[in-house]
Regions:
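N-terminal/domain-start alpha-helical segments
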Residues: 1-123
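Short, Lys/Arg-enriched segments at the junction into DNA-binding effector domains
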Residues: 2-3, 118-141
Length: 141
């Protein structure tokens, strides 16, 4: 199964993301802090994609990204954050993220971006974004 880690400290946003990714066929592991995310990745080495918020208590998403990249160059990383300044985007990509999505976001777009990372990671099966886009065509604020 396609396993994803979602790091988001706000429970309502995390729940929204998790519900939509599970509907799309993903096995989702949740974390609400940077430290917890790193622990979950160590316990689940088969995670192929990580969605990381930036603004977190303790270790921020940029540092989580750096630490992941120090030990795992193959995992796909998407920064998923409200920070939309160009410098934040550049920093995210320079620390090792493969993509950067700002809130509000479309769940259909997020699923398509996750699918793209799975395709690049080795041709694994992706979610049926065409079938679910009508259901997921809502924007989250």
């Amino acid at each position: 199964m396609k396993k994803i880690l979602v790091l988001e400290d706000e429970a309502s946003i995390r729940s929204f993301i998790v519900i939509n990714l599970r509907r799309a066929g993903y096995d989702v592991i949740e974390a609400e802090s940077g430290e917890e995310a790193l622990e979950r990745l160590r316990a689940n080495p088969d995670v192929k994609v990580a969605l990381l918020d930036i603004m977190l208590p303790g270790i921020d998403g940029f540092e989580v990204c750096r630490r992941i990249r120090a030990t795992n160059t193959k995992i796909g990383i998407i920064m998923l954050t409200a920070r939309s300044q160009e410098m934040d985007k550049v920093t995210g990509l320079m620390t090792g993220a493969d993509d950067y999505v700002t809130k509000p976001f479309s769940p259909a777009e997020l699923t398509a971006r996750v699918d793209a990372l799975f395709r690049r990671a080795g041709g694994e099966e992706t979610a049926q974004t065409g079938e679910i886009s009508a259901v997921l065509a809502v924007y989250f604020f």
